Amino acid sequence: MKYSLGPVLWYWPKETLEEFYQQAATSSADVIYLGEAVCSKRRATKVGDWLEMAKSLAGSGKQIVLSTLALVQASSELGELKRYVENGEFLIEASDLGVVNMCAERKLPFVAGHALNCYNAVTLKILLKQGMMRWCMPVELSRDWLVNLLNQCDELGIRNQFEVEVLSYGHLPLAYSARCFTARSEDRPKDECETCCIKYPNGRNVLSQENQQVFVLNGIQTMSGYVYNLGNELASMQGLVDVVRLSPQGTDTFAMLDAFRANENGAAPLPLTANSDCNGYWRRLAGLELQA
């Protein structure tokens, strides 16, 4: 299996991102995704900056993929997305059907991101015709669902025409909204948010009345409160999953990437902690569950 670093979903300063990707260039990742995937108002790093970072990574020997917005809300955003799609060098991760259409019109291959509502083989076949070469499974699906879906793909004769990627580490994006919950948590309207999410480099925690961390707010994203960690599920991915994705949580992610690789065959199990780690979705359980 290959290992990928997903796009940074948090709002980090440009300098922090540049330092992160400098380390990513020498990491054990096979694939690096980068780009603004959450909110177009996060302008500390502009489209041109992302493209420059991608070019600086091009000589690392890794596949570089440009990630795009999961929720397109304005015509101005389409102009920026067009710059990504027409970059002329790097593969695109499409997280919105508008970007899928842009790629299809230009006959460009793309990665279908986990934000696309793709739950069956017929949908995958449609995306294949439009140029999909890799599919990142929606985060709430289980191993059992994946097995059944790939069996459907076998019946349609398309199983070997695309790669399967699974988001296997990080806070999971559970929902997207036109509203900004981070701004709302500071009693700000979205139009006057002052990109306050930059104050929360790992999101803003939401606790239940029982003091359980149930969610993390990240701008328009509502994310899982616990960190999804499938580091001990890698053996069960053999023959099903081509690319294991880790969502950056900070520079510690590189050590976690190495730990995943070391445990690919179950030789070095990762220590997981209840009330901070979870693997429920993969096991077909409630998402916040952790099953050994």
Curated annotation (Swiss-Prot):
GO terms for biological process: ubiquinone biosynthetic process. The keyword 4Fe-4S applies. Its cofactor is [4Fe-4S] cluster. Keywords: 4Fe-4S, Iron, Iron-sulfur, Metal-binding, Ubiquinone biosynthesis. It comes from the Bacteria. InterPro entries: Peptidase_U32 (IPR001539), RNA/ubiquinone_mod_enzymes (IPR051454), UbiV (IPR043693). Changing residue 39 to A: Does not bind iron-sulfur cluster. Disruption phenotype: Deletion mutant is unable to synthesize ubiquinone under strict anaerobic conditions. Mutant shows normal levels of ubiquinone after aerobic growth. GO terms for molecular function: 4 iron, 4 sulfur cluster binding; metal ion binding. [4Fe-4S] cluster binds at residues 39, 180, 193, 197. Pathway: Cofactor biosynthesis; ubiquinone biosynthesis. Pfam families: Peptidase_U32. The keyword Oxidoreductase does not apply. Changing residue 180 to A: Alters ubiquinone synthesis in anaerobic conditions. Does not bind iron-sulfur cluster. Belongs to the peptidase U32 family. UbiV subfamily. Forms a heterodimer with UbiU. Required for O(2)-independent ubiquinone (coenzyme Q) biosynthesis. Together with UbiU, is essential for the C6-hydroxylation reaction in the oxygen-independent ubiquinone biosynthesis pathway. HAMAP family: UbiV. This is Ubiquinone biosynthesis protein UbiV. The lineage of its organism: Bacteria, Pseudomonadati, Pseudomonadota, Gammaproteobacteria, Enterobacterales.
